[in-house]
Amino acid sequence: MANQENVELLKTGVTGWNEFRKEHQEVSPDLSGADLRSLDLRRAALSGADLSEADLGGTDLSEAELVYANLCGALLAEGQESRSGAANLSGADLTRAALADADVTGVNLSHAKLIGAELRGAKLLRANLFRADLTECNLCCALNYANLSYANLSGANLSRADLTDARLNGANLTGANLSHADLSGAHLEDAVFGATILADIDLSDASGLDTVHHSGPSSIGVDTLYRSQGQIPDDFLRAAGVPEEVLLYLLPLIRRRAQVSVAPQG
């Protein structure tokens, strides 16, 4: 449960709060479950704070420091539970922050630093992550319609992530794990691949594969070729390091089998 003194001090304004944090660096503020809706917390010093289950709907947290902050289960989104609109976290430092199971639907996280952040089970539907730094972030979560354009996703864990209709154009996906992810309708124009894990996923409905830049070979499973029914550009596969024998012999076989399976029965 939140420390009410901490809560009241924060509500008086960022200037006094930041002075308190500077003078009492040993204190880890307990703001868990607090009602912090619609506050102006721009540039607030919230590193190490416990904000789990807090209601931050409509709160402006742009450029706030949230390094190692605990936001598990926090309400950040515009929705029925928090009626104050989505929080603004643009440019915020959320390095190593815990956001597991947090509702971040529609939240502005553009240019935010989320290096190593824990986002398992979080809802990031329609979230704005434009140019966000998600290096080595755990993103096994819902990212439907999210804007990840030009985001740094190098080394990120996106296994089983729902990236339906997500915008990944220009995103850095080197070393990212996309195994079992749903990329239906995803936009990959000018994305960067290299040492990217593409196991057991369907790439047939993703757009822009022919414009992807390859910094090196990636890992593409045969299961991905079958699930995609061979509907992956040859140039993409070749640049990703798929052996020429696979392109010459296995890929045509997969494509023919797919055509036969959809042919009308006479």
Task: Please name every model-derived segment.
Residues 7-8, 16, 20-234:
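Tandem repeat scaffolds
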Residues 23, 256-266:
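Conserved N-terminal substructure of TIR/SEFIR domains
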Residues 228-251:
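Structured, non-catalytic alpha/beta "coupling" segments that mediate domain-domain communication
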Residues 18, 29, 245, 259-262:
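Residue-level signal for secondary-structure boundary elements
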Residues 1-8, 12:
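Eukaryotic acidic, serine/proline-rich intrinsically disordered low-complexity regions
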Residues 32-34, 248-257:
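Short linear loop/turn motifs
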